[in-house]
Amino acid sequence: MEEITFEKAMERLEEIVDLMNQPSTSLDASLKFYEEADALMRICESRIRKAEERVRELSEKRNEDFLSEEESFVH
C-alpha cells in the first residue's frame, strides 16, 4: 500500500465501514474490504505508536531541561 496519511487512512476506514454495512455488499466484497481495512488499521496503529514515542521523547527532554535549569539555580 502506498504512503498514506493517518487522516486519509481513517477516512478510508470510515468509507469501508459504510460499504460493509450496505446489504447489497457481497461476501467476497466484504472480505476484500476487511483485508483493506486491516492494512489501514496497521498503518494507523503504527503512526499512533510513532507519535506517542515522539511525545514521550519531547516530554523527557523537557523534564531533563527543567532539571538542568533547576540545578543551575541551586548551585
Swiss-Prot record:
PANTHER family cross-referenced by the UniProt entry: EXODEOXYRIBONUCLEASE 7 SMALL SUBUNIT
Quaternary state and interactors: Heterooligomer composed of large and small subunits.
Keyword Hydrolase: yes
This protein's name: Exodeoxyribonuclease 7 small subunit
Taxonomy, superkingdom: Bacteria
EC number: 3.1.11.6
InterPro entries noted in UniProt: Exonuc_VII_S, Exonuc_VII_ssu_sf
Gene Ontology BP annotations: DNA catabolic process
Organism: Chlamydia abortus (strain DSM 27085 / S26/3) (Chlamydophila abortus)
GO molecular function, one term: exodeoxyribonuclease VII activity
